């Protein structure tokens, strides 16, 4: 289905969720997100969430040479990595912050 520009706002209003599916929070500033390669609509997201998604996609494609089809797997791996249990080793930057916290 082709969605002309003059129908975009009405479509967005009818399809916007209660909260942004990317940032998991309510907003009043919605946009219709689309794949820049295919032009197909992915959904309705917050403007800030859409901006974040664009920055992540551009960085992954341009700097990391991650293909569009491989990006979801990479993002899942990043989420798994961030959620994993931390090692019992303090980084030097952590020591600096700890000393600031202990000696205000």
Write out the residue ranges for each language-model feature.
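Short, charged surface segments at domain edges that flank catalytic/cofactor-binding sites
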Residues: 1-19
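Polybasic, low-complexity binding patches
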Residues: 37-40, 53-103
């Amino acid at each position: 289905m082709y969605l002309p520009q003059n129908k975009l706002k009405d479509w967005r209003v009818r399809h916007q969720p209660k909260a942004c599916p990317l940032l998991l929070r309510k907003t009043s500033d919605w946009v219709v997100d689309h794949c820049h390669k295919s032009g197909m609509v992915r959904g309705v997201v917050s403007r800030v969430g859409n901006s974040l998604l664009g920055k992540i996609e551009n960085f992954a494609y341009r700097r990391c040479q991650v293909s569009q089809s491989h990006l979801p797997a990479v993002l899942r791996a990043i989420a798994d990595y961030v959620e994993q249990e931390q090692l019992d080793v303090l980084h030097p930057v952590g020591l600096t912050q700890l000393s600031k916290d202990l000696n205000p």
